[in-house]
Design a protein with these regions (language model features):
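Catalytic center-proximal scaffold of phosphoryl-transfer enzymes
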Residues: 1-52, 99-462
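Short Cys/His-rich Zn2+-coordinating modules
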Residues: 46-60, 82-92
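Short metal-coordination and nucleic-acid-contact micro-motifs, chiefly zinc-binding Cys/His arrays
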Residues: 60-70, 84, 97-101
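Amphipathic alpha-helical interaction segments
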Residues: 63, 78-81, 278, 418
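Short cysteine-rich clusters marking metal-coordination/redox-active sites
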Residues: 71-74, 104-105
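Cys/His-rich microdomains that often coordinate metals
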Residues: 75-78, 111
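Short, isolated positions in well-ordered beta-strands
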Residues: 78, 95-97
Length: 462
């Protein structure tokens, strides 16, 4: 069977053009034909799409240039200054088109500048979908892996280099940030009854030229009472008006000056102060029960090393494990002072055992050191500890476990140490802007909205 694909292009003036896109042929389909010869191959499909894109873009560009040559003031034709070539990168190949430049009209009413119509429809020398796909692939995969996948499945012609993918991703991230700091133009569509802000931090290895070995990244998950969740990420050292960006996220979820905001954190000053400054309504800080339980778990692990050679040692180990469990129970129910009293009594016993010449003196000293660290942590965060048992029964947020998984999803899968990656704070910040938008499922819409913040090297023609 032989086949031929022809495209018919009908212009606004009624002119019709026919262009042959691709041809092919094979024998009749019978039992002797191999399955590989059935239908279009990937290479033939790429060739067909590339040919269709080439003729379509060239026809659209020529029609736009003809329409823009007519002066809007007097209706006369602008004089042709020169003729150039312009390349447009798209997902279906790189197309080279004729790009005429027109001088100012002799009437001098509409414009006194040179007009390049092709630059109006090709501002970034690529289609928005091409730039969006490159940025999305670069945010989800290592740049070299993204390049290989693009080369495998798209008829790109000239496959973009790794540096091109990186620059496109950074450029889109900068646009998203400029759009995020823009003040909201409207009030929330619906007011939220309550908002939960779970914020945590992670660390990314920095490039060798930076001052420190790693830098901190803030990752937050914001949710309202309707169940809508939005992720937020930022590098404090590079963020442009970080508080305003987070305030914009709260605004989109329905935050008003009357909406209470519950801030879940590990007690560190940085995340707490960021959430406090970004909230426009009343705030309530809660210590994440996950971090608190991990501190208690460290004490329990240290207590497992207690010697059990004699029945007396086993009895002491059982008493110690029982005391740790009681400390856990009291903290879980918000009884901070009772927990501190029990910690103090246990430390007295452990310190006395550490001063003896028995076999478990070393174990007692080790457990006492870890338990004393828990005492310091609980004392410093006592105002943030609540009755977690009651809060859980009332379906109130008590943990940042989902935010921990968000840190794993945003940071470690793309920027983790096992890939031997090192990042500059600025590069990591812009990368996270794109990656967060992709994870939130709003990247396509955000990319379109942020188009107004594109900084391009040419002036807008009249």
């Amino acid at each position: 069977m032989k086949w031929r694909i022809v495209v018919e292009l009908a212009g606004a003036d009624g002119a019709v053009q026919f262009h042959e896109i691709s041809v092919g042929g094979a024998g009749t389909v019978d039992h002797s034909v191999e399955p590989l010869g059935l239908g279009l191959t990937l290479a033939e499909g790429k060739k067909t799409l590339a040919g269709l894109q080439r003729h379509l873009v060239q026809a659209q560009t020529e029609e736009h240039c003809r329409n823009r040559r007519r002066c809007q003031g007097c209706g006369a034709q602008r004089p042709l200054k020169d003729m150039r070539r312009r390349r447009l990168a798209s997902l279906f190949g790189v197309v080279e088109v004729r790009a005429p430049r027109f001088g100012p009209c002799r009437c001098g009413v509409a414009s006194r500048r040179t007009l390049t119509p092709a630059a109006e429809i090709m501002p970034d020398r690529c289609t928005p979908e091409y730039e969006r796909t490159l940025a999305k692939m670069g945010a989800l995969l290592p740049y070299r892996r993204a390049r290989s996948l693009l080369e495998e499945f798209f008829p790109l012609g000239d496959t973009p280099q790794v540096e091109t993918i990186r620059q496109r991703t950074m450029r889109v991230g900068a646009r998203l940030e400029r759009d995020a700091v823009a003040p909201p133009t409207s009030s929330p569509s619906s007011e939220a009854e309550s908002i939960t802000l779970a914020i945590d931090g992670g660390h990314v290895k920095s490039v060798r030229s930076y001052q420190v070995r790693s830098f901190e990244v803030f990752v937050a998950q914001v949710s309202n009472d309707a169940g809508k969740r939005v992720m937020f990420s930022s590098v404090p050292a590079e963020a442009d008006r970080q508080q305003q960006q987070l305030r914009g996220v709260l605004h989109r979820l329905g935050a008003t000056p009357r909406t209470p905001v519950t801030i879940l954190s590990d007690g560190a000053d940085g995340p707490r102060s960021l959430g406090e400054a970004a909230s426009v309504g009343p705030t309530h800080h809660v210590l994440d029960c996950f971090h608190l339980s991990m501190r208690i778990q460290h004490v329990a692990q240290a207590a497992r090393g207690w010697p059990d050679a004699t029945p007396g040692d086993r009895a002491e180990a059982a008493c110690l494990a029982d005391a740790i469990e009681h400390i856990r129970w009291r903290l879980w129910h918000g009884q901070v002072q009772r927990a501190l009293d029990l910690i103090g009594d246990t430390l007295v016993i452990l310190d006395a055992a550490a001063k003896t010449a028995s076999l478990h003196a070393a174990s007692a000293g080790k457990v006492a050191g870890v338990l004393r660290g828990l005492e310091t942590y609980v004392s410093g965060q006592s105002s943030l500890i609540i009755d977690y048992a009651t809060a859980r029964r009332n379906d109130e947020p008590i943990s940042t476990a989902t935010t921990e998984s968000t840190v794993q999803r945003l940071l470690h899968r793309r920027m983790s140490a096992n890939q031997q990656m090192r990042w500059s704070p600025r590069g990591a910040h812009l990368m996270l802007k794109v990656r967060t938008a992709v994870v939130n499922g709003t990247f396509n819409n955000d990319h379109t909205t942020a188009e107004r913040w594109a900084r391009r090297p040419f002036r807008h023609a009249a």
